Amino acid sequence: MGFYSMPRYFQNMPQVGKPLKKADAANEEQLKKIEEEIHQLIKEAQEAGKADADVNKRGELTALQRIEKLVEPGSWRPLNTLFNPQGNKNGSVAIVKGLGRVNGKWCVVVASDNKKLAGAWVPGQAECLLRASDTAKTLHVPLVYVLNCSGVKFDEQEKVYPNRRGGGTPFFRNAELNQLGIPVIVGIYGTNPAGGGYHSISPTVIIAHEKANMAVGGAGIMGGMNPKGHVDLEYANEIADMVDRTGKTEPPGAVDIHYTETGFMREVYASEEGVLEGIKKYVGMLPKYDPEFFRVDDPKAPAFPADDLYSMVPLNDKRAYDIYNVIARLFDNSELHEYKKGYGPEMVTGLAKVNGLLVGVVANVQGLLMNYPEYKAAGSVGIGGKLYRQGLVKMNEFVTLCARDRLPIVWIQDTTGIDVGNDAEKAELLGLGQSLIYSIQTSHIPQFEITLRKGTAAAHYVLGGPQGNDTNAFSIGTAATEIAVMNGETAATAMYSRRLAKDRKAGKDLQPTIDKMNNLIQAFYTKSRPKVCAELGLVDEIVDMNKIRGYVEAFTEAAYQNPESICPFHQMILPRAIREFETFVKK
């Protein structure tokens, strides 16, 4: 500790933010009420299915109990807890997923929820699994499965088994991860036929419980391989006889086959806990840099408490706030060395530290921007949260420099969109927005996006949004999050303005159209709120305001755990570009 490169660039960077003058009790109450609603939905989803006690009576641990024993205390960062895009009755896609440290290393962990249909594949699960492999690929960290999967839920097989991003796609992704040198480690429990079998066999290392099995098909499938096309009494009796027989024999693919004969299973354990210890053992064999190798400063907590965010981030999106106060509560010692401060004033870009590790930060500024943007008439007033020419140019430069210097990026998004109109078109905003997407796509660095409040229009994409599948490791929202292509009033006006004009000209009653407009406005509001954002996967988790820093830490430490490429500190350009602008341009 204490021996760091280029301390005059990276230590004692400018501090930002101010102490909270007065708590906003009403705002805090509103935000915490929404957080509590999310907590309750999570509780209901986790408790759905068999009771924990009933699972334990069978000699099994639940998915959450297995994760608790696998992951280091305090390191679990849940992801996609409420993800349920097709409305499964149990409120989830029957897996538990997140980032956590296993034997000192950050891993993406996915556990079959054995409380629900014995961990079956259900609608939406494949997409959630693909997001897990996306996160592992982007962060270059191991993917760990705690598998207990009974295969496809047959009565909804058309929503689970086929399709381009369907039940088989995660097996191709596991192959891709192996080819990229990203290990996939699985611990298997219980019966895993068909989709469960391929889920078992596709990882790098297979560790099994002594009662586990994995197979192309289970006993039930074997019994129905020569169907008549219908079920009659004779066939029903044959099925019943088969069940009686197989109940007394081992299902296909048990340990005596895949450990003793094929050798597919690397190790077998007699206890539930033994399998988890086996996973830890193999994770322990994997490469990892000591974080001290990449540190530029001693780890420090932010200078201000995270609880201040409940007063500083208004739930009412018509109210502005100081983004520097947010940054000050997320990064080490509330330090930020800003890139091109004053240019593109609608955006903050700069270098910050997370537990002593460098990250790039990009965030929207709120409030009025006087005499801006420059391409409009003199005396124009820009609106914070909107993107203009200078801000887009600055972000393109910043992302490109972060990519060159191999620095992960944290995006803090609260945007109403990109400026519109002929002035904006002449200022090339359409092209500059796509330029930023190009810069992000070519960066090949891990990025993490927080939708602090609003994610709107194309700005939601270009500000490091989750649409960047190859760069966005994951994204989170808050109790204040609202994601929609535009606000409801704008949508209603765009959709019904001509109808209003036409009806008024014809002397018709406008009230029916007014009612439709108000219904659309309400629908936009309802469908853009945190609950729906979580269920549809518009963000990967709704996170309490005072827990955002924990996700920033997990992302940053994971990104530096085993990076694909490195830029030596003394060869970086971004910190020097910041210094040059401050010294020779700004003055």
Curated annotation (Swiss-Prot):
- Give start and end of each CoA carboxyltransferase C-terminal domain: 295-558
GO CC term (a single one): methylcrotonoyl-CoA carboxylase complex
- Which EC number applies? 7.2.4.5
InterPro entries cross-referenced by the UniProt entry? AcCoA_carboxyl_beta, ClpP/crotonase-like_dom_sf, COA_CT_C, COA_CT_N, MCCB/AccD1-like
* CoA carboxyltransferase N-terminal domain mapped to chain residues: 31-298
Q: Name one GO biological process term.
A: L-leucine catabolic process
Q: Output the PROSITE patterns linked to this UniProt entry.
A: COA_CT_CTER (PS50989), COA_CT_NTER (PS50980)
Locate the region Carboxyltransferase.
Answer: 31-558
Q: Name one GO molecular function term.
A: glutaconyl-CoA decarboxylase activity
Q: Which SUPFAM superfamilies match?
A: ClpP/crotonase
One Pfam match, given by its short name, reads: Carboxyl_trans
Name the reaction it catalyses: (2E)-glutaconyl-CoA + Na(+)(in) + H(+) = (2E)-butenoyl-CoA + Na(+)(out) + CO2
Pathway given in the UniProt record: Amino-acid degradation; L-glutamate degradation via hydroxyglutarate pathway; crotonoyl-CoA from L-glutamate: step 5/5
**Protein keywords:** Biotin, Decarboxylase, Ion transport, Lyase, Sodium, Sodium transport, Translocase, Transport
What does this gene product do? Decarboxylase subunit of the primary sodium pump glutaconyl-CoA decarboxylase (GCD).
Tell me, how does this one assemble? Heterooctamer consisting of two alpha, two beta, two gamma and two delta subunits.
What protein name is recorded for this chain?
A: Glutaconyl-CoA decarboxylase subunit alpha
What is the source species?
Acidaminococcus fermentans (strain ATCC 25085 / DSM 20731 / CCUG 9996 / CIP 106432 / VR4)
Give the classification, highest ranks.
Bacteria, Bacillati, Bacillota, Negativicutes, Acidaminococcales
